[in-house]
Amino acid sequence: METLFEVAETTAKAPAKTDQLYSNLEEYKKIINTNPKTKWVKANPYANNALYLPIGIVEELLNKVFPFWQVEQHGEPKIIGNSVVISVTLKVWHPILNQWLSYAGVGAVPIEVQQGAHPTDFTKINAKALHKNVPAAMSFAVNNAAKKIGKLFGSHLNRKDSEI
């Protein structure tokens, strides 16, 4: 049986069956309320070194903890100010509760314009900006939704006081 701390050690292998990770609600709560491994956590130099989990880690954790999960995008990407904004619902199948659980998430990424251009001068958008900014906003939205599941998914990474 894989322990909580070995959950992502097998990311190169096939996903573990969730019944190997938890068999009751208390075990599930223990898993999702454990801090992520330090080696998974990265600092974002563009956001005052805010800590985050890369989307690849989040997706592997979703694969390990839940038998099924899916992302539903709400409408089309929106442009607000100079950013691409995407809203999603992350749905995970909880095998103990025998139901889908839903978590809302929003992601935004500034649209890249040519150096020196005003951020909202859309005549100066870099050629491939939206090609990479839209998927990045989607990744941030999924990551934001997953944080709501628990500490394992990064919910407490940037909190000063997280103990009750």
Residue ranges and their predicted role:
Residues M1-I55:
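N-terminal, Lys/Arg- and Ser/Thr-rich interaction peptides
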Residues V58-I164:
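Positively charged, aromatic-enriched nucleic acid-contacting surfaces
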